[in-house]
Amino acid sequence: MPHDAVVIGGSYAGLSAALQLVRARRRVLVIDDGRPRNRFAARAHGVLSNDGRPGFEIAAAARAQVAAYPTAAFRMAEAVDATRIDDGFSVAFADGSRTMGRRLILAHGVEDVLPDLPGVKERWGRTALHCPWCHGYEVGGGPIGVLGRGDHAVQYASVVAEWGQAVLFIDPARLSEDEARMLARRRVTIEPTPVERLEGEAPTLTGARLVDGAHVRQSGGFAERLGCEMTDTPMGRIVKVDAQQQTSQPGVFAAGDLARPAGNITLATTDGMTAAHAAFRSLIEEETA
């Protein structure tokens, strides 16, 4: 018998979706490969009632709560493909096995594409960061370097300036007069010299902390192979969804970072709940048609 829903991704969005569905007494399988996007950060911040708690602890507590319901199932494995079949969807695993679900919720997140800069990888999530809302309070108060990559660099630097002495590494010729004036009002320093490497003994960093709005790429490619419509954002390509987290493909829902240009734990859990409610309603409609 197929699951009522298969959730690919067992972090905040996926667990939130699963919790709603198992509370509706629906059979749910959560698939997770154990590699959450925030695994490089020591703590999660800005999460109501969990501010400063390690992200893996938040996820572990959520997983235990979901697992307490008898209709919940988990599989720690890598999903490699998802296809539509007559009764719903078939999900393939790396070992060649398959499982089936009447609805599919994609919550596997995205991967940060780091700048090609020596020293970034070993500092990522500690002193080389991507989200001022997540880490700005802890690293603020001193100089904060911002890599001037992409069209969103100027806006990003103006936001980062709230937490410290922002230094934007960018060719001044790329700035319009309005942008230059706005950065000056925000007291952002323009540094034309390109950053060649990060120095210091990792994960520490000599001088300024580094913030970069690293763009993202979809993990797994499930949405595109299923024919879901995608949309381009300054942060990268994401799955296009409506207000109910429904993709362009019937029966396929997307929640969390893979379906929004900027994410955090709170937004991911909200998306997961919304997707679960929509998936539940679609099951009811099918069963009563």
Regions found by a protein language model. Give the residues of each.
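Beta1-alpha1 glycine-rich phosphate/pyrophosphate-binding loop at the start
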Residues: 3-57, 142-143, 148, 154-174
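Active-site glycine-rich loop that binds ribose-phosphate moieties when present
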Residues: 126-133, 143-156, 176-177, 191
